[in-house]
């Protein structure tokens, strides 16, 4: 009887261990975004959807107005509070594994990390969903947000003009979150 209980317990533990990575993969990846002072400005959850990734964001303490959101090439969000205009340069440029030009309206684009603008309300909050069909959560794919150690989700001070190369005149980087496995 005791051996039977041990066997059932061991089988349950193995089944649970095998199921956990799949549950995490199906649930997506949640990223905390912080400003240059290290204060949280909210979260974004990346979920595999169709041929791309759906990003659900819940943001706070941001300047009202239209802002750009991009995926950047490095999984780094090093900020310098003394030089906010240069914050998060460690994240590199836009994620662009296919070597295209910037902008959703650019015939030679877009970068894999280019996405539509979003609006922050007068109260400093924004909640919404954006789809990026050019990236994936699948490890090993060249357009995976986890490639080369990961990427970063970036919020800029201004809206992206959707065509200027290399970054859409979106202004300083004001919030950043690291995307890693």
Residues covered by each model-derived region:
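N-terminal leader/targeting pre-sequences
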Residues: 14-181
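Bacterial N-terminal signal peptides that target proteins for export
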Residues: 1-10
């Amino acid at each position: 009887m005791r051996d039977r209980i041990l066997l059932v317990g061991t089988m349950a533990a193995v089944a649970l261990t095998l199921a956990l990575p799949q549950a995490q993969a199906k649930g997506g990846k949640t990223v905390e975004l912080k400003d240059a002072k290290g204060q949280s400005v909210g979260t974004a959850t990346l979920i595999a959807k169709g041929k791309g990734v759906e990003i659900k964001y819940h943001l706070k303490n941001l300047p009202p107005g239209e802002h750009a959101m991009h995926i950047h090439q490095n999984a780094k969000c090093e900020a310098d509070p003394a030089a906010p205009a240069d914050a998060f340069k460690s994240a590199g440029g836009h994620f662009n594994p296919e070597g295209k030009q910037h902008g959703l309206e650019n015939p030679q684009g877009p970068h894999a990390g280019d996405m539509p603008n979003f609006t922050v309300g007068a109260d400093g909050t924004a909640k919404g969903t954006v789809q990026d069909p050019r990236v994936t959560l699948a490890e090993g794919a060249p357009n995976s947000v986890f490639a080369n150690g990961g990427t970063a989700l970036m919020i800029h001070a201004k809206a992206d003009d959707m065509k200027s190369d290399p970054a859409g005149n979106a202004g300083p980087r004001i919030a950043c979150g690291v995307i890693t496995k």
